[in-house]
Amino acid sequence: MKRRALLAFGLAAALLSAAATAEQSKGVLSVKVSQLRSNDGQVGCALYASDAGFPTDPSKAAQMKWCPIKDKSSKCSFDPILAGTYAVACFHDENGNGKLDKNFLGIPKEGTVVSNHAKGSMGPPPFDKARFSFSGADSSLDLRMGY
């Protein structure tokens, strides 16, 4: 009987500890995007938890934010997220149409940037080059828009 009570207590303590750890490992990720070429439009920031859709399909992002521009920079904050591996992709929607405009070859006509300032060789950068570890503590990224 004592053994069962001790086992139940140990299990309850482990579950409570795991729940507390999970709650503690959530934090806000803020992204500051600078070097925009104008104050026109808005900045779209997408947070990806995997390579699915990265960086061209924001509908597959874990979170998508539209952020205003002031003094040729913008700041986006993502809702609290769990510790883990993520990548961020941002673009300057200069004309405010809610999408990244491209030329007839599929090359962006508006500014883009991804975390780690990763570059692709013949196309968009891969998730593996842009990914970073998020500890769960509030933190920030500073990105410079490229055109």
Tell me what each language-model feature is.
Residues K72-C76, D128-A130, S139-L141:
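Short strand-edge motifs at loop-to-beta-strand transitions and within beta-strands
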Residues A8-L16:
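Bacterial N-terminal signal peptides
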Residues E94-K102:
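Acidic, glycine-anchored loop motifs typical of Ca2+
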Residues G27-L36, L143:
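A short, amphipathic beta-strand motif
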Residues F78-I81:
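Short, flexible loop/turn segments at beta-strand junctions in immunoglobulin-like
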Residues M1-F9:
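Bacterial N-terminal signal peptides that target proteins for export
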Residues G84-C90:
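A short tyrosine-centered beta-strand micro-motif
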Residues L16-Q24:
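Sec/Tat signal peptide C-region and signal peptidase I cleavage site
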